[in-house]
Amino acid sequence: MERRKHNTQDYKILALDVATHCGWALDKTIYGVWNLTPKRDESAGMRLIRFRSKLKEVITSEHINLVVFERPGGRHVGAVIVQSELQGQVKVICEDLNIPYRGYSSQEIKKFATGKGNVGKPAMIAAAKQKLNYTGDNDNEADAIWLLELAKSEYK
């Protein structure tokens, strides 16, 4: 997506921390986690089906017109594969619906939130509590909220 400055009032943004426990945020106070874990007798593809369903539901019901997500990364190959599959779903759905999307690296999000690009999950949660009045304890939610704030700062 072309990087341009926009007024965030033009956008209804959905931020996604794509993973099996997928953090999402629409606002500093409207956020959550989708548990996409396949059940015992299901194939791994059910994670993608659940994700597609939830993503389409939120995009249509909330009139989303910009989706931002954390790009896959890390040392755990299995997690990177899952993140890549989910990111692919985001891109396909957004392309189908003609909705712009943007990926951010973990380091970009962490640096925006804390000033350092290599902090751990507890530091991201603590920064969200201190700076954004976040009341939860879930790193997936905190990451999604920070991602939303980063996108808002870029698209003002």
Please describe what each predicted stretch is.
Residues M1-K156:
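Phosphate- and other anionic-substrate recognition elements at nucleic-acid/protein interfaces
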